[in-house]
Amino acid sequence: MRIILVCICAWFVAQVIKVILNTIRFIIDKKKGNVTKKVTIGTLFKLGGMPSSHTATVISLSTCIGALEGFNSNIFAVSGVFAFITMFDAFMVRLPVEKLTEAFIGVREKVEGKDVKPIKKVEGHTIPEIIGGFIVGAGIALLFLKFSPLFPEYVSLFAA
């Protein structure tokens, strides 16, 4: 259960960073006069953007498992494969789907007189966004492992 808490915290921190970065972007765009998106509380639950919260979550999971069970353990191998698939999907699947969705929305907007239902834009991740999520996830996990009373057996491993 304690590893789940670390994962939730990593996800939350990544989402808060997204809100902060989107707010900064909004302020800069507003000053330039080209505001396209608003920042709302709903931004906290949006997919896509910097950093990848999916990556932060799975990397925090893998980091905790590796630290507690051993980096040679079978469960760490499983979590590592799971993390790789998640990051691969974010970049190689969701990003192209985002581009296709944008193209479809553009075509749909040009079709007049047709009853075409709008589709929700799916957002993927760029490599820097995935790396950002990796850093957040590993960082949060290491902070919990070092400083949290949830992991007393691991705190002693940091002692010299």
Question: Residue spans of the language-model regions?
Answer:
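N-terminal signal-anchor transmembrane alpha helix
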Residues: 1-22
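Membrane-interface helix-loop junction between the first two transmembrane segments
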Residues: 16-39
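Membrane-embedded catalytic cores of phosphoryl/pyrophosphoryl-handling enzymes
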Residues: 12, 36-160
